Amino acid sequence: GTGITEEFEEVPVQSRGFGILDVGYR
């Protein structure tokens, strides 16, 4: 991926719904 979504592309599509919120989770 690119930019801020770099890490989110690694996780399942289901988790992508969290988007930026996942940053605090991880």
Swiss-Prot record:
Keyword Lipid metabolism carried by entry: no
Classify the source by domain of life: Eukaryota
Q: Which UniProt keywords apply?
A: Chloroplast, Photosynthesis, Photosystem II, Plastid, Thylakoid
Where can this protein be found? Plastid, Chloroplast thylakoid lumen
What Gene Ontology cellular component terms go with this record? chloroplast thylakoid lumen; photosystem II
Set out the biological process GO terms recorded for this chain's protein.
photosynthesis
Q: What is its main location?
A: plastid
Q: Domain comment text?
A: A 7-bladed beta-propeller torus, about 54 by 55 Angstroms, with a depth of about 25 Angstroms and a central pore.
So what family is this one in?
Belongs to the Ycf48 family.
Q: What does this protein do?
A: Essential for photosystem II (PSII) biogenesis; required for assembly of an early intermediate in PSII assembly that includes D2 (psbD) and cytochrome b559.
- This chain belongs to the protein called Photosystem II stability/assembly factor HCF136, chloroplastic
